Design a protein with these regions (language model features):
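N-terminal chloroplast transit peptides
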Residues: 1-12
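A glycine- and charged-residue-rich anion-binding loop/surface
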Residues: 12-1022
Length: 1022
């Protein structure tokens, strides 16, 4: 099978950098010449490169060929937009038979990122034209000598009944290629297949002899020589492989070609290595300038310092990383991408002894590729923000997990083979694996269950699990692991509990086995908008299946009735361990419905199903493999007993709760506006998950350590409310996968796999905010229906995990009114504080009551987050003001008290307070008097303490704070108190000391008199 992989090449002679720096044609001109040849000369339509993120194929980690974005056409999901196409596709390959990551940088041509030049025909031209175009471009426009070119064609396969492609052979001969240079090869080299089944066909390859030898080199084709390589692969998609492996002709025929851009540039610039071209040389110069290391010399086999290989790896990886991040890939969602980022960081720090080199190189990559891929320039700040975050995370891991892992490797040296040893959960994951080894040794298999636990609980990737399995001599059951991983994603998408997974799987198997038709739920988007309100229809439907306590009923023989009689009939079909009839869970499967099932973070509708005179209350709705199951209970019948019975095949009428649906629509549209506003304000952000209900929206997102300020949150709220006031339309359109790729500035979920058809895009365009998302949820027709938007909460979990809770509509309006009510209370409190000189203890009581009300999480109606924060800040400010006001009042009172025992002739103050100040400290009281020596004692509840102050201009050896306080220490038989940070000659204190009630009066009187006497003696001398 041939999958557009360049043949493995055998290095037969050492390559070194070309000594000539002359560039005959620039890489840019070579690319443009290819595109213009097909666009201008041959009337092809240019379709830009898709992102390197595979949006429609979960079997690949990255887009790895030009044909990926056209698979929907080949699989006949939709018609092509035009019959002739040309493009240059960004591709990434980091694994596979010929793409070992460890080879990159150690040979002349392997890369993680490369460009694939290609042209396509969707039912226009076929073999003859495709071959002629390729030959003409290579020989006449690029000037490659015909003598250096060889072609291969499909030689047939008798087992599959496939004849040699003699038509292709004859075309090459008619073009003028000599017979000895037209060579047949088998399935492996010259037959292309998309997968195990699907479109396929023979291919023809053009090979080039880099040595330009006159002697015929036919015998060396496809033998792995580096000087005789495949240049262009032309695939003729004319067959289809069926699931039984037979191959039959297709009704439509396609041409699909691919040529490696870097290899073509190396050939035309006459370089022996791709790294010697002007694709990589600017990156080498950027590295050398930033790291201040010796220049790149192009050494391969004599590179003892590993500097040149470091140049090559870093240049290659920086291209791959910058392109992948600019295209919306997130390291958190792609272990392979994170692995390469960390490898590049490691080389930058260890080989070039420089931090931040990867971020610096992103500028050079954007300069190099930005003209043909403008998203690199547009998204450069986002790219650099993510690189900064990854560098910081990697550094923290090295300082923590890295040390512990190295200790583990010392105990078990085989663990050195684990490449991603910086994985956060690796250490604990390996300990878990060791614990389970005794159970695994018997089977010699690392089961899907154990592997899934390693991934789900410890975050280990499939690659790391595979490496650990090899170390422990276990076979890794990767298929079982991938199945469990897929089930997890599916459960998460549809909101299915883990405990329901097995049950759901059995039910779906039975439904499909009995060929029960899937539910048509396209009606969920239908409503009539009359300018003010949305009106939802009811639809007539038919019951195709019933689920009672997990048991599926598909035929008319079994029947159930309403709650009063259902248990009697269920005894026939339900075991004795089922719940009582009051708790019976019933699911109704219909052939069509207008109910939205829980999906994409949006909660399901609720409503009713009317069957005859029975009313079934829909509590929640789930969609599993396109079967929509309505879970709920029957309403109590008005009569004591109902003779009506429910059967498969019964007709019914379905309606939804309009208030719930409108609330959900409002909040989902609000979530889109919030997401758009976050992207507008933050450098890099992506939504991790969301929850949309009828009364609230919750968004969890990664901001790569960037936190939102209060002002930014205010701007977000104002921006969204301005869009609501503008009453702009919310439009939707349906596109296919190829059309999706052509959409500019669209928000997609990282790691999400989108279908080939029926992709719904929701757009909101206003003057100051634009939102465009691929979304299957329900939305309002215009933003005015949201009425108001307010944030309810904002908090972070960890360095990058931010959470926002918000509301729109009547819920937001109610929250706003609650907030305004609290604001009025605070304003009244402020007025009282100003006009009534409110006592601090009274103020504190009122203030605390308001604060408790604001922070009460059990409030029936929440207060908007911004109002809450403003109110709490205002209360804190008022508290400070009230405290200052109380202190001033107390200061005035104490000053009057002290003033009463002093007069203008006093040259010192000695006084005792008998009431503990509420707001002033003893130090603050002493500080009232900064120009004269002051000693204040405080007696309260059987204890006495004191503090004194002596001005610096008065302090001396005979009279200073310490010697003055010593008078009191001797009387109370105690020690000095703490005066941390003060000069002991100027400030002194006495430790709090207990004295008896009988002695307090005499001791305090004695202390006052002796302190006065001491001060009088020494101040008189001054």
């Amino acid at each position: 099978m041939h999958f557009y992989t360049m043949n493995s090449l055998l290095l037969i002679r050492p390559y070194s950098s070309s000594t000539s720096n002359t560039i005959k044609k620039s890489a840019k001109s070579i690319r443009n010449e290819f595109l213009n040849y097909f666009k201008k000369d041959l009337g092809h339509t240019f379709i830009r490169s898709s992102p390197v993120t595979p949006l429609n194929d979960q079997t690949i980690a990255f887009v790895n060929a030009g044909m990926n974005q056209f698979k929907g056409i080949f699989l006949d999901y939709y018609d092509p937009p035009t019959t002739k196409v040309v493009n240059s596709q960004k591709c990434i390959r980091i694994s596979g038979k010929h793409n070992d990551l460890n080879i990159v940088g150690n040979d002349t041509y392997h890369h993680t990122f490369f460009e694939m030049l290609g042209n396509w025909s969707f039912g226009d031209y076929f073999k003859k034209e495709a071959c002629c175009y390729a030959w003409d471009l290579l020989t006449k426009h690029y000037g490659i000598k015909e003598d250096c070119l060889y072609v291969t064609y499909f030689g047939g396969n008798e087992e599959l009944g496939l004849k040699p492609d003699l038509e292709c052979k004859d075309i090459w001969l008619s073009i003028g290629v000599s017979k000895d240079k037209v060579l047949p090869f088998g399935m492996q080299d010259n037959f292309w297949e998309m997968g195990i089944s699907g479109p396929c066909g023979p291919c023809t390859e053009i090979h080039v002899d880099h040595t330009k030898q006159i002697a015929n080199q036919s015998m060396r084709i496809n033998k792995g020589y580096t000087d005789l390589t495949e240049l262009w692969n032309i695939v003729f998609i004319q067959y289809e492989r069926l699931t039984d492996s037979t191959i039959v002709p297709l009704s439509k025929q396609y041409v699909d070609t691919g040529m490696g851009f870097e290899r073509l540039v190396s050939l035309l610039q006459e370089k022996k290595s791709n790294y010697d071209t002007d694709i990589f040389q600017p990156l080498f110069k950027a590295i050398q300038k930033f790291a201040k290391t010796p220049e790149y010399k192009g050494q391969f086999h004599n590179d003892e310092s590993k500097l040149d290989s470091g140049y090559r790896i870093l240049a290659d990886h920086s291209r791959m990383i910058t392109v992948a991040l600019a295209d919306g890939m997130i390291p958190e969602e792609s272990n392979k991408l994170r692995k390469i980022i960390r490898k590049a960081i490691d080389i930058g720090e260890n080989t070039f002894k420089k931090q931040g080199i990867l971020l610096e190189l992103s500028y050079a990559v954007a300069d190099s590729l930005g003209d043909v891929y403008p998203e690199l320039q547009t998204n450069l700040k986002k790219v650099q923000k993510i690189i900064e975050f990854e560098e910081d995370s990697f550094k923290r891991l090295q300082n923590t997990c890295g040390k512990d892992w190295k200790k583990m490797v010392e105990i078990r040296p085989d663990l050195v083979a684990v490449t991603d040893w910086m994985s956060f959960g690796l250490l604990n994951g390996y300990k878990y694996l060791q614990h389970t080894l005794k159970d695994l040794k018997d089977t010699k298999v690392l089961s899907g269950d154990v592997a899934f636990n390693l991934h789900d609980s410890y975050g280990l990737s499939a690659e790391t699990i595979r490496e650990l399995a090899n170390i422990e001599s276990l076979h890794f059951d990767e298929k079982a692991f991938q199945d469990k991983l897929q089930n997890l994603r599916y459960r998460s998408k549809i909101g299915l509990e883990k405990s329901s997974e097995t049950l759901a799987k059995k039910i779906i198997e039975l439904l499909e086995k009995n060929q029960i038709p899937k539910t048509d739920d396209t009606f969920k988007y239908e409503y009539v908008f009359n300018g003010n309100n949305c009106q939802f229809p009811t639809i007539a439907s038919t019951i195709v299946g019933l689920i009672v306590n997990g048991n599926l009923i598909l035929n008319r023989e079994n029947e159930i009735t309403n709650e009063k009689t259902v248990s009697n009939i269920q005894k026939k079909i339900v075991d004795s361990n089922t719940k009582s009839d009051q708790e019976d869970e019933i699911g109704i499967i219909l052939d069509k419905t207008l109910c939205y099932s829980m999906e994409g973070g949006q909660t399901s509708d609720n409503g009713i199903i009317c069957i005859k005179d029975l009313i079934f209350n829909i509590i929640n709705v789930r969609k599993i493999n396109d079967y929509v199951i309505h879970f709920g209970k029957f309403a109590q019948s008005d009569s004591k007993y109902s003779n009506e019975k429910l059967k498969v095949g019964d007709s019914c009428v379905v309606s939804i709760n309009p208030e719930v649906r409108i609330g959900i629509m409002q909040h989902h549209t609000g979530a889109h506006l919030l997401n758009a506003s976050l992207k507008q304000i933050m450098q890099a952000v992506y939504s991790r998950n969301s929850h949309i209900s009828s009364h609230v929206l919750k968004l969890q997102f990664n901001s790569f350590k960037e936190k939102l300020t209060f002002e930014q949150l205010k701007k977000i709220e104002n921006n969204i409310n301005s869009v609501i006031q503008a009453d702009v339309p919310v439009t939707t359109k349906i596109v296919n996968s190829l059309e999706l790729l052509s959409e500019d500035f669209i928000t997609l979920i990282p790691g999400e796999i989108y279908p080939y058809t029926g992709i719904r895009i929701v757009e909101i365009y206003s003057n100051n905010l634009k939102s465009k998302e691929a979304c299957c949820g329900t939305h309002v027709p215009n933003t005015g229906l949201l009425k108001h938007f307010c944030l309810l909460n904002y908090f972070s979990k960890g360095s990058a995990n931010l959470n926002i809770k918000a509301a729109v509509g009547s819920f937001a309006m109610s929250a706003k009114l609650e907030g305004e009510n609290v604001q009025r209370k605070i304003l009244n409190l402020e007025q009282k504080l100003k006009t009534e000189k409110l006592a601090y203890d009274i103020f504190k009581t009122i203030s605390q009551e308001i604060k408790n009300d604001i922070t009460n999480d059990d409030r029936k109606t929440p207060i908007p987050y911004l109002i809450k924060e403003e109110c709490l800040t205002k209360l804190n400010d008022l508290n400070k003001n009230a405290w200052v006001q109380a202190k001033e009042i107390e200061k005035s009172t104490l000053s009057m008290d002290i003033k009463g025992i002093t007069n203008s002739t006093n040259i010192f103050i000695v006084h005792c307070l008998y009431q503990n100040p509420m707001y002033l400290s003893l130090h603050e009281i002493v500080s009232f008097y900064t120009n004269i020596p002051t000693l204040i004692m405080l007696y309260h509840n059987g204890t006495v303490r004191a503090r004194c102050y002596v001005p610096q201009e008065i302090a001396s050896e005979m009279f200073n704070a310490q010697v003055w306080m010593k008078v009191l220490l001797d009387i109370f038989n105690t020690d000095y108190g703490p005066i941390k940070g003060f000069n002991p000659l100027l400030i002194a204190s006495m430790a709090t000391t207990s004295i008896s009630d009988t002695l307090q009066e005499s001791l305090i009187h004695k202390a006052i008199e002796q302190a006065k006497a001491f001060a009088s003696i020494h101040t008189r001398k001054m």
